[in-house]
């Protein structure tokens, strides 16, 4: 009888241990922070991945690209997200090698609130730059009316709305303006946070969209999905080939196809003001940032699996949320790149 009692005791002990093991399996939380630009699709991805893997909860704070880079560098989050690639100085200062993984593409659009003007305005890069620098101050300035014949624009003062936080959306916007206007590059420059000559600041894409929506005579810049969600007017922008192009899945994808032909190994590439017919000039990849050799191998393995899913099955969610999916050539390169992450 002793062997039977012993076996029963072992079995009973194993059963008692199951809930504890199960609880541990249910408590894998991975924290990330960064860009607001991709928040709508990241939120969708993390939710759907949790449905596939209930034991995993990915928590993401959309605090802006600058904040995401800082928190990743300080190792207070497991992954970061940015719309502007890290600088070489930031990468060098980080405690370990970091890999940039493009996730989707989007377009940054000039949004405006002009009472009684409900048409799509045309902008050149130079005109946008002069507005942002405070050199064009009225909506009926000849530089604007000359691009928009037949549109009656008022003599209303222009209020510039910009980001108050470190922002990849800002990086994309000023990167384009710096290519279109050498004077803007010299005066304002390219960074996730710049010294704005004029205007008022809002936090996140949501904050800028809210400012523009509530401020008659205003202009700002947000990711396309935020303009659509908030029902704010946005304009077309002249590309390098001289066309005035409206942001859309097709025009952003056209920009990506140009980049796909010469993608650098580290994936840090700018596609603003790309050449080509039908290309929207203020387009960009957005990136998730991961350490190549993290100390937490369990979370690393989960994030590698998540990235493989996001780069393949997850891409189908992009169009409905206003993003362009990655070109197949870029996905193939990334699936090879994630193998560098140690799990």
What are these regions (language model features)?
Residues 1-5:
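Positively charged n-region of N-terminal signal peptides that target proteins for export
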Residues 24-343:
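Flexible loop/hinge segments at secondary-structure junctions
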């Amino acid at each position: 009888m002793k062997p039977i009692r012993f076996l029963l005791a072992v079995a009973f002990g194993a059963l008692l241990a199951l809930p504890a093991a199960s609880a541990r399996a249910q408590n894998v939380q991975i924290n990330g922070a960064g860009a607001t630009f991709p928040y709508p699709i990241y939120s969708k991805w993390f939710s759907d991945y949790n449905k596939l893997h209930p034991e995993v909860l990915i928590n993401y704070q959309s605090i802006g690209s600058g904040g995401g880079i800082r928190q990743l560098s300080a190792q207070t989050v497991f992954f970061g997200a940015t719309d502007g690639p890290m600088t070489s100085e930031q990468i060098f200062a980080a405690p370990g090698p970091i890999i940039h993984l493009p996730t989707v593409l989007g377009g940054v659009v000039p949004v405006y609130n002009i009472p009684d003007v409900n048409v799509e305005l045309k902008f050149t890069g130079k005109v946008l730059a002069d507005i942002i620098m405070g050199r064009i101050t009225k909506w009926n300035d000849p530089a604007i009316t000359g691009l928009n014949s037949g549109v009656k624009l008022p003599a209303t003062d222009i209020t510039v709305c910009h980001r108050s936080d470190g922002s990849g959306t800002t990086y994309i916007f000023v990167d384009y303006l710096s290519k279109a206007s050498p004077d803007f590059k010299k005066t304002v420059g390219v960074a996730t946070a710049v010294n704005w000559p004029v205007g008022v600041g809002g936090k996140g894409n949501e904050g800028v969209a809210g400012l523009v929506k509530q401020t008659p005579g205003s202009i700002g810049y947000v990711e396309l999905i935020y303009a659509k969600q908030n029902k704010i007017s946005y304009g077309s922008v002249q590309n390098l080939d001289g066309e005035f192009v409206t942001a859309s899945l097709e025009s952003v994808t056209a920009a990506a196809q140009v980049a796909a032909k010469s993608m650098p190994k580290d994936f840090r590439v700018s596609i603003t003001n790309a050449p080509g017919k039908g290309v929207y000039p203020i387009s960009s990849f957005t990136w998730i940032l991961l350490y190549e050799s993290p100390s937490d191998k369990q979370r690393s393995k989960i994030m590698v699996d998540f990235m493989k899913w996001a780069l393949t099955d997850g891409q189908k969610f992009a169009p409905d949320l206003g993003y362009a999916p990655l070109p197949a050539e870029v996905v193939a390169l990334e699936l090879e790149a994630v193998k560098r992450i140690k799990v």
